[in-house]
Amino acid sequence: MTKSLFRQSFLTDTLDVHIDVAPAEQVLSNGVKLKLYQRGVLEVIPEEYTQETKNVIISCGVHGDETAPMELVDSIIKDIESGFQKVEARCLFIIAHPESTLAHSRFLEENLNRLFDEKEHEPTKELAIADTLKLLVRDFYQDTAAETRWHLDLHCAIRASKHYTFAVSPKTRHPVRSKALIDFLDSAHIEAVLLSNSPTSTFSWFSAENYGAQALTMELGRVARIGENDLDKLTAFDLSLRNLIAESKAEHLSKPCIKYRVSRTIVRLHEDFDFMFDDNVENFTSFVHGEVFGHDGDKPLMAKNDNEAVVFPNRHVAIGQRAALMVCEVKTRYEDGELVYD
């Protein structure tokens, strides 16, 4: 048996800052190649790799305290090593911010998932990580066809949600809402997908905007520490992710996800800013048309559509930052294989 790349496992070694992580390679008995580039970055290459092979980035830990995806990824990599998990897609597994994970913190100095645009940012630990991740994505997608590129950036929500799992589809200049991607969400029993209406600065947006990748930010349950996650609630997602890696069809029934469009983004403009609901309000809490739910200066914040719902509310953001997204359910259809709505 070939000696493992890991002393214990991909996740455990990544979080053990007392050991050095040097670049290394391993070829398994089934011909699958593992390439460890640095702490928390592992490429997996199938024995047969062609121009049609999917090139899939599976990232987690962009927010260090969102650990359920790390545990799922660690289990998949163990099964790849043992030969139990079939590999037909080329994959790049990333645990993005180990130092933040060890601190049980979302981030240390700045929100990493807001640093993937081309704007100037103050130097921070997170900015250095973002710059490294951009290069990893560039190198991974080099000489690949755009239609083979996927990026699933896996997170957990910091608040309760009316949808235990949901995804955010970035808005880009490329067709990145393919039927195959939505079929994956349905197979994974992801309850809802939120269709962004403007560019952002997230990791998944970066891959979609710059490389045309089928990319999603995926919210998988609630924040918890390693070992305390309820992974049973993510079984369908785990199976579908494994099927994606194996390029095999699901054996379980799909569940169509609810589609939401972003109706508007609430940006904090004044020091005198507040919501009328508690900090622990659930994502996707809805309001009736005209209902006031906060204020920004002397301007009331109110629902402009019936059943308009709030997602990612944060009354504590700095002036000029996004304080919430407002979303509405929307009917969708496919045009030329792409999900669209009127």
From Swiss-Prot:
Q: What keywords does the record list, in alphabetical order?
A: Arginine metabolism, Hydrolase, Metal-binding, Zinc
Q: Name one GO molecular function term.
A: zinc ion binding
Please give the pathway this protein is involved in: Amino-acid degradation; L-arginine degradation via AST pathway; L-glutamate and succinate from L-arginine: step 5/5
What are the names of the required cofactors? Zn(2+)
The lineage's top-level taxon is: Bacteria
Residues that, per the record, bind Zn(2+): 63, 66, 155
- Which terms under GO biological process does the entry name? arginine catabolic process to glutamate; arginine catabolic process to succinate
Role summary: Transforms N(2)-succinylglutamate into succinate and glutamate.
- Name of the protein in question: Succinylglutamate desuccinylase
The organism named in the record is: Vibrio campbellii (strain ATCC BAA-1116)
**Chain's gene name:** astE
